[in-house]
C-alpha cells in the first residue's frame, strides 16, 4: 500500500532521545532527563481529586465540540486575571492539546500550498503538521541580537500566515508588547494570518508575558494545560479565535475530533484554581533556571540567551561540535544526561546547538549539572 507524499514528515528528534534514554534506563542506568519539556510534577492534586469525584457520578461521554461551557468561561476569566482583558467565552475553543489547536487553526486558515512563516529555532512540530496538511513551512532565521525571535524585517513576501511563540521553545525568550505589535501589524499589512503560541504563559521569570490578544482581536491564540498546569499527558488545550471564525472551527472540530477528552476537561477546570500548587511549581522552575544559568557556563556551555520564560536553555555549542545529534548521544552515553539536539528546532543551524530542559525536580538539575561538568572536564 502506498504512502502519501504528505506523510513524509521528519521525526520528532526529542522523542527519539526519550526512547534512547528509556532504553538506557531499562538496561539499569540512571538517566537525568534534560531533553523533554515535561514538568516533573503531576496534574494538581485538587484537579485529580475533582476528576475522581466526577467519575463516581458522570459517565464522561462526549461533550460539545467547543468544550464544556464551564471550562470555556473559566478560561475566559483567566484573560481578565492575567491580561486585564474582557474575553467573550464564545471565542474560546477547547482542544485535544495544543497540537489539536494547531491542526484546527491551519485547516481553517490556509489552503493547500500556502506558505506559513515560522521563526527558527522553533517548535519542530509546526513544520511537520504544516507539511502533513500540504502546506509549505517557511523557516525564518532569527538572530541572537533579536534574542532568537523574528522581527518584521525578517518576514519574506508571499506568506499566508506567521506563527510566533512567546515564551519560545527552545530559547525561552519573550516578545514584549511593542515587538509583538510590530509583528502583528506587519503580518496583517501583508494580508496574512497571525497565530500566537502562548502555551508557556504563566511560566515567566523576567517581566510579564504579553498575549497577542492585547494587541488585536484578529489573531488566533493557542494555549495548553500541559506546561503551567502540569497536564502533558491529559491532552487538553485551547485556542481563542475571532468571533466570526468560531463556527468554522466548530464544524472542523466536530468532524476531526468530536471533542477534547471529557475527563481531561473536568481535570483542567479544577486545575485552574489550584493556585498554591501551581505557584509552588513555578518557584521550583525559577530555582532550576538560576541553577542552569550559573551552572552551564561552569560546565563549558556559556553561549546562550538567559530565558525569560518556559523551562529551556538553548545553547550554542559550536565550540564543541558540528554534529549536535552525535554530541547529544555522547552526553547520554558518557554522562547519563539526556539533552535535545538543536536540529529538532533549526534544520539549518541546529547542528551546533543543544536544548537543555530544567522542568524536572531541583535535585535532578543539580545532579545533571554535576554530570555535565565532569563529562566536559573529561572530554577536554
What residues fall within each predicted segment?
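PLP-dependent enzyme catalytic core of the Aspartate aminotransferase-like
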Residues: 77, 81, 330-339, 345-380
